[in-house]
A protein has these predicted regions:
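Short acidic/polar active-site loop segments enriched in Thr and Asp
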Residues: 41, 85, 124, 221, ...
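Active-site acidic/histidine proton-transfer and metal-coordination neighborhood
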Residues: 74, 78-82, 86, 95-194, ...
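Generic structural signal for well-ordered alpha-helices
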Residues: 29-35, 72-76, 111-115, 152-159, ...
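A cross-domain feature marking catalytic cores of carbohydrate-active enzymes
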Residues: 5-9, 45-49, 88-93, 128-132, ...
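Acidic/histidine-rich catalytic cores of soluble enzymes
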Residues: 11-19, 25, 42-43, 152-260
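Catalytic-face loop-and-helix region of soluble metabolic enzyme cores
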Residues: 226-228, 264, 271
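A short, acidic, flexible beta-alpha connecting loop/helix-capping segment that sits on the rim
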Residues: 280-291
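N-terminal pre-domain/capping segments
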Residues: 1-120, 164, 191-194, 297-305
Length: 305
């Protein structure tokens, strides 16, 4: 099993004191050094081709890599200087509205763009969210079965274009593929498409991550090592901004090792199914990125012995 560190750990979408520092190139250059020093020699990138254009240094699109880092090779050199020798994968949560046809066509365009960039970056995997957030679906909820059938067919087409890149579907607790519902959907999808198993999302949806992995079996394509203590007693998943509940606990995700996900059981299940792909740490909503890197390394060392 190989480990990577996701740059989604950095808060780029919500305001906080001194948030603008993350728009500076020096911030990312130092972050890469910290990631490498923490023993992570591969990273995962969020993909957002239009976010902020080239006005900041979030390395999440080809445009920013070209303008701020001198292209893909220039970006990879910055990583290499920090002892990061691999971009393991990229991910996105394509969002669209309108009819089933409009949603699926928008989804396909987004994934094709991801696959193109992943090829340039030398990624091993691309992960996508096939389901929109429940609260944004509107009229699509009445056509759920039609939408899922169309998405399953689209993923089969995209698998043809993926080539050696492993295309995986992410599970999210706020989508219509939450929890065990993912298995029914994946049964319809081309076997070349794998599961992207996000531990915290599975647990919040009321499932046991280790059992989920066993049921997915050899179709586990990538594992996202997330943690949580959150219990969705108020069905936050159905409302707006489910990652930021309006009542009760306001931090849904925890740094790896700080929540209630049983990592030992997860790693045992991964061994049972013969998983040898990427396990990517994502400390989303961390209160301090540098501390989160060390917490994750400590948690992995404890599990791996």
């Amino acid at each position: 099993m190989k480990t990577a560190f996701s740059l989604e750990t950095v808060n780029t979408r919500y305001q906080e004191p001194n948030r603008n520092r993350v728009e500076s190139k020096y911030y990312w250059e130092e972050l890469f050094q910290l990631v490498g020093a923490g023993g992570f020699h591969a990273v995962e990138l969020p993909y957002d081709p239009g976010f902020m254009g080239a006005r900041c240094c979030f390395p999440f699109s080809k445009v920013v890599m070209d303008v701020k880092f001198g292209g893909v090779e220039g970006f990879k050199k910055v990583l290499a200087d920090a002892k990061i020798d691999k971009i393991a994968g990229i991910f996105a949560s394509p969002r669209a509205a309108g009819s089933v046809e409009q949603y699926v066509e928008g989804f396909k365009r987004s994934v094709k763009g991801m696959l193109g960039l992943a090829g340039e970056l030398g990624c091993d995997y691309v992960t996508v969210s096939a389901s929109p957030e429940y609260c944004t679906m509107g009229a699509l909820l009445d056509k759920k079965a039609e939408l899922l059938d169309a998405l399953a067919a689209a993923l089969g087409e995209l698998a043809d274009e993926a080539g050696d890149i492993k295309l995986c579907v992410r599970n999210e607790f706020w989508g219509i593929l939450r929890g065990a519902g993912m298995h029914d959907f994946m049964a319809k999808v081309d076997k070349r498409v794998g599961y992207c198993v996000d531990l915290a999302h599975i647990k919040i949806a009321g499932e046991d991550p280790a059992e989920f992995i066993r049921k997915a079996g050899d179709r586990v394509g990538v594992v996202i090592l997330t943690d949580t203590c959150f219990e969705d007693k108020d069905e936050v998943w159905k409302g707006p901004a489910p990652a930021f509940p309006r009542t009760g606990a306001t931090q849904v995700f925890k740094d790896l090792g700080q929540g209630s996900v049983d990592l030992c059981a997860v790693f045992a299940a991964l061994k049972e199914v013969g998983f040898d792909g990427w396990a990517t740490v994502d400390n989303r909503q961390t209160r301090q990125v540098s501390r989160g890197i060390l917490r994750a390394r400590y948690a992995l060392n404890a599990v791996e012995g």
